[in-house]
Curated annotation (Swiss-Prot):
Positions on the Cytoplasmic side per record topology: 1-21, 171-176, 231-237, 284-348, 396-403, 451-463, 515-554
Record: glycosylation sites: N71, N198
Organism, scientific name: Oryctolagus cuniculus (Rabbit)
Molecular-function GO terms, alphabetical: acetylcholine transmembrane transporter activity; monoamine transmembrane transporter activity; neurotransmitter transmembrane transporter activity; organic anion transmembrane transporter activity; organic cation transmembrane transporter activity; prostaglandin transmembrane transporter activity; putrescine transmembrane transporter activity; spermidine transmembrane transporter activity
Annotated site location: Involved in recognition of organic cations and participates in structural changes that occur during translocation of organic cations: C450
Record bears the keyword Transmembrane: yes
UniProt membrane topology term: Multi-pass membrane protein
Positions on the Extracellular side per record topology: 43-149, 198-209, 259-262, 370-374, 425-427, 485-493
This protein's name: Solute carrier family 22 member 2
Mutagenesis or variant effect for N71Q: Higher affinity for TEA. Loss of plasma membrane localization. Loss of plasma membrane localization. Loss of plasma membrane localization
Similarity field: Belongs to the major facilitator (TC 2.A.1) superfamily. Organic cation transporter (TC 2.A.1.19) family.
Compartmental location: Basolateral cell membrane; Basal cell membrane
Induction: May be down-regulated in diabetic patients.
Gene expressing this chain: SLC22A2
Tissue specificity annotation: Expressed in kidney.
């Protein structure tokens, strides 16, 4: 009996139905962007200072300019290490009772300001921004700044749990059902987050979004690759990630137009309600139906695909079977990922690369909000370079191979991070160029690890290997907010130094992996172990063995 791939040979690998389905699912990929990196705008931390009762009235009475008000009433101005004092401390002065003058009002209290006692902010903060973010609304600064780290870590914890749990449910109950359920929950949680009355509820709804959003993105990825023919799977997989990049560009524009975080959150959530219409637009995966022995339903869907593509099914292709032959089933085990030396090495290197790809990708985006430039333009420019990154991958993986482009992309990302440390702030053009190179490098590395991970494991542990290794991506996402925001409190460029080290190490480790270009996917542990061996040498061994076997006959 024919397989799905056999029927797609007749009805079209990537014709009208597949293009329509790809467009619809690509919208989900683009809509996932605000959840993954929306922290840049939702959690933007503007310059701030303690709110001191009486200062505003005194400033108005004396006719101070904004600069004079800061100079007279805020500690730490001009000091190299005065950021903490300027943003988190205040003079312990009762501005309403001390009757200060308008010229150097603190001079009557102490001849030297350094002798005046300082205390923590007690009446909130004043933020230098026309809009709002979760930071400004819930005062997530100074002693409460860790709560911003937790906000982003919560969504990554959700990614970690949801990808495993909902991934299992999608294999058990079907792609379409799980996709629609994740869309509905995501839409509801996003709206509830936009109207959250306090930080705790906002955190809970963000965690719920994390539980379902990445899983929904992955289900969309699986669906489109299962609807197209074999020769198009790699291309549509990369283009599905390009749709995520389009979402980055749209997010920058929407965030610029809507500087208030609640309206921004509501706006980027509303498209998910439209995605519920996919119930009538996208069928279940025929490959999944066959795996569940629902061949009749799978055949009806293939007939629907043929009709959409303007084709007709030959009489000889009126039944379906699974692509895999029925035989002895091997039960995968976590120990299989570390039992043999080569697979153990592959597992360790892949886990590290998933972790570093997540840390560098999310970390570079988060660092944009702290670098002091135009956050909207910097975000937009850095997103643009993801397009050439995707097309470079398509152009090189089947010509040059996987290993060298992957290693170089990691090293470029690491070197760009290190170079950024030494670029002066006044060279804005050079700073943006270096940042874009780093972003392009880590984008290529991210997409390459997705591709190569599946090519290094034998069939019976391939899904398990991808699942376990890619889980380190979410662990990296959990760690990254604390890494970025805590290290910048020590030195603004310190996260870039850390990114440079882990990126360069990742590039070196990739060179220890085998090249998988032109190789069939390994079916057994033995074949996976022999991937490191050059094919030419392997042919020589077979040749010698045959000569020895023929020897006694001559």
């Amino acid at each position: 009996m024919p397989t799905v791939d056999d029927i797609l040979e007749q009805v079209g690998h990537f014709h009208f139905f597949q293009k329509q389905t790809f467009f619809l699912l690509a919208l989900i990929s683009a809509a996932f962007t605000p959840i993954y990196v929306g922290i840049v705008f939702l959690g933007f931390t503007p310059d701030h200072r303690c709110r001191s009762p009486g200062v505003a009235e005194l400033s108005q009475r004396c006719g101070w300019s904004p600069g004079e008000e800061l100079n007279y009433t805020v500690p730490g101005l001009g000091a190299a290490d005065g950021a903490f004092a300027r943003q988190c401390m205040r003079y312990e002065v009762d501005w309403n009772q001390s009757s200060p003058g308008c010229v150097d009002p603190l001079a009557s209290l102490a001849p030297n300001r350094s002798h005046l006692p300082l205390g923590p902010c007690q009446h909130g903060w004043v933020y230098d921004t026309p809009g709002s973010s979760i930071v400004t609304e819930f005062n997530l600064v100074c002693a409460r700044s860790w709560m911003l780290d937790l906000f982003q870590s919560a969504v990554n914890i959700g990614f970690f749990i949801g990808s495993v749990g909902i991934g299992y449910l999608a294999d058990r109950f079907g792609r379409k059902l799980c996709l629609l359920v994740t869309i509905l929950i995501n839409a509801a949680a996003g709206v509830l987050m936009a109207v959250s009355p306090n930080y705790t509820w906002m955190l809970i709804f963000r965690l719920i979004q994390g539980l379902v959003s990445k899983a929904g993105w992955l289900i969309g990825y699986i669906l489109i690759t299962e609807f197209v023919g074999l020769n198009y799977r790699r291309t549509v997989g990369i283009l599905y990630q390009v749709a995520f990049t389009v979402g980055l560009l749209v997010l920058a524009g929407v965030a610029y137009a809507l500087p208030r975080w609640r309206w921004l959150q509501l706006t980027v959530t509303l498209p998910y309600f439209c995605f519920l219409l996919y119930y009538w637009c996208i069928p279940e995966s025929p490959r999944w139906l066959i795996s569940q022995n629902k061949n009749a339903k799978a055949m009806r869907i293939m007939e629907h695909i043929a009709k959409k593509n303007g084709k007709s099914l030959p009489v000889s292709l009126q039944s379906l079977r699974a692509a895999e032959d029925v035989g002895e089933k091997l039960n995968p085990s976590f120990l299989d990922l570390v039992r043999t030396p080569q697979i153990r090495k592959h597992t360790c290197i892949l886990m590290y690369n998933w972790f570093t790809s997540s840390v560098l990708y999310q970390g570079l985006i988060m660092h944009l909000g702290l670098a002091g430039g135009d956050i909207y333009l910097d975000f937009f420019y850095s997103a643009l370079v993801e397009f050439p990154a995707a097309f470079l991958i398509i152009a090189t993986i089947d010509r040059v191979g996987r290993r060298y482009p992957w290693a170089v992309s990691n090293m470029v990302a690491g070197a760009a991070c290190l170079a950024s440390v030494f670029v002066p702030d006044d060279l804005q053009g050079l700073r943006i160029t270096v940042a874009c190179l780093g972003r392009m490098g880590i984008t290529m590395a991210y997409e390459m690890v997705c591709l190569v991970n599946a090519e290094l494991y034998p069939t019976f542990i391939r899904n398990l290997g991808v699942l376990v290794c890619s889980s380190l991506c979410d662990v990296g996402g959990i760690v990254t907010p604390f890494l970025v925001y805590r290290l910048t409190a020590i030195w603004l460029q310190l996260p870039l130094v850390v990114f440079a080290v882990v990126g360069l190490v990742a590039g070196g480790l990739v060179l220890m992996l085998p090249e998988t270009k032109g190789r069939t996917l390994p079916e057994t542990i033995e074949e996976a172990e022999n991937l490191q061996r050059p094919r030419k040498n392997r042919e020589k061994v077979i040749y010698v063995h045959v000569r020895k076997a023929d020897g006694p006959l001559t």
